[in-house]
Design a protein with these regions (language model features):
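SDR active-site strand-loop-helix element
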Residues: 1-12, 55-58
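NAD(P)H-dependent oxidoreductase Rossmann-fold/reductase module
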Residues: 14-183
Length: 183
């Protein structure tokens, strides 16, 4: 399962504000990326035959830039118009990379003997997961497939030890329960 969001950008997590209603603007990306990754860990524990990955797509030139309203939108469009092409990942290339992530055997689920996905060829290694091991089923990657660094692995280990995976799962269950309630 590929989630296009903020892979390899995990950061400080605010467990008392999981919805990020009061998280400082500068910390939102790290908080939400961590929330997603911890959620993936909770899902992987319940579905060990599925691999979960969060990928940061990089700056992809899309129509979203054209639809940004107001003064900020004008500034964004001016920047995009004059920005060098090398600042952006072409949309086709982004799609190709994410298709690779979704189908490659380099990102196996926790269970399944590494037999899922397209068989890796010589020279392609099994990716390192967010727990620091290979093949444990939860991945966080930058746009080019670079795995989350050791600092992020250590941070997520700390959150795991503090019981945050379970807290994120309970929060998600509470939110889904509230949304689907007939009351």
């Amino acid at each position: 399962m590929v989630n296009i969001a903020g892979g390899a950008t995990e950061g400080y997590f605010y467990p008392s504000d999981m919805q990020a209603l009061n998280v400082p603007f500068y910390a939102i990306r790290g908080h939400l990326s961590t929330l997603i990754t911890l959620g993936h860990e909770a899902l992987a524990a319940r579905a060990p035959g599925v691999s979960f990955m969060q990928v940061f797509p990089g700056a992809v030139r899309t129509p979203l830039f054209d639809q940004t309203p107001g003064v900020f939108g004008v500034l964004v469009r001016c920047f995009v118009a004059v920005a060098p092409r090398w600042l952006f990942v072409p949309i086709e290339e982004s799609g190709e990379r994410n298709l690779f992530f979704a189908t490659s055997g380099a990102y196996p689920a926790r269970e399944g003997n590494g037999k899922s996905g397209v068989q890796v060829v010589e020279g392609v290694d099994i990716a390192r997961c967010v727990d620091g091991n290979t093949g444990s089923g939860v991945y966080s990657m930058d746009y080019d497939g670079t795995e989350a660094g050791q600092k992020i692995v250590d941070l997520l280990k700390q959150y795991r030890e503090e019981g945050m995976v379970q807290r994120v799962w309970e929060h998600a269950q509470e939110v889904f329960g509230r949304i689907t309630s007939l009351d």
